[in-house]
Amino acid sequence: MVTDQGGRTSEADGGPVRHIPVLLEEVLAALEPAPGKVILDGTFGAGGYASAILDAGAEVIALDRDPTAIAAGQSMVSASGGRLSLIHSRFSGLAEHAPAEGLDGVVLDVGVSSMQIDEAERGFSFQKKGPLDMRMSAAGVSAADVVNRAKVSDLIRIFGFLGEEKQAGRIARTIEKRRAEAPFETTRDLANLIETVTPRKAKDKIHPATRVFQALRIFVNDELGELAAALFAAERALKPGGRLVVVSFHSLEDRIVKTFFQDRSGKAGGSRHLPLVTARAATFAPVGKPMVSASDEEASRNPRARSAKLRAGIRTAAPSPGADLSIFNLPELASLARLGG
């Protein structure tokens, strides 16, 4: 919830590395930062969006749940002339950090950052041997805790729903047999086992472990629950005319964002299950296209941009109707949240 999922470019003179996040131009076009505006960046990461927003003259309140990102960003704070505040916080709590008069914009870049993936000791990548951790902060259960202790039925739900893994049952049952002999400790332990269960075929575009690792990361960090809570928080924190811009990389993330904007713009209709939908004033109006994806040029330059989707809305003056997870029609969210708790 990939905080900044872009690549990195080095300055020609050998100066500092500048992080270029995904869909930067598109994010700025939707967000419209300018002098006098206060923008909240809910996923600071390596500071790519925050830096560009500062360059446009706006003030930035930046959040990140990863203490490593907070520490690394202190030099940006010092160089900002007081226009950047960097706060260790989950973005679900963004309304707590908004000024009383409201925010002019909120940007969220959802998921795991390239910085986190690149650090083997964080345990996010199956391509690097490291501890099976995947936590964005030191709190909570690790991926190893889940793999070694969860019921097989729960592993199947996690891999199947969050990872959309078709072989969830086979993988979970094989994990159960293996952990009875020795616990899983490293990323390679788990990746190697998955490869034996679902060996890679020549036509496969992704590694066999991709979906399971993605599912564990999303579960360990409650990424979908955090995203849903952040959308409702942004609705409360934005002033009329303020803009909410969200970049997501996973189909379930995009489904949540799309559903939120449809519901809040009054475009969500009934269904055979919920045929009667009470009309209410729209709290968001659309910005540009319903969904923006990376250009072919950006996708070829940065493979991580291929799955990126941007959605945005402008806050109206209508009062927030409050948080309601039922609008997403994802009962699995509450079920998995109870499991994580």
UniProtKB/Swiss-Prot annotation:
It comes from the Bacteria. Gene3D superfamilies: Putative methyltransferase TM0872, insert domain (1.10.150.170), Vaccinia Virus protein VP39 (3.40.50.150). It is found in: Cytoplasm. This is Ribosomal RNA small subunit methyltransferase H. GO terms for molecular function: rRNA (cytosine-N4-)-methyltransferase activity. It comes from Sinorhizobium medicae (strain WSM419) (Ensifer medicae). Its main location: cytoplasm. S-adenosyl-L-methionine binds at residues 47-49, 64, 91, 109, 116.
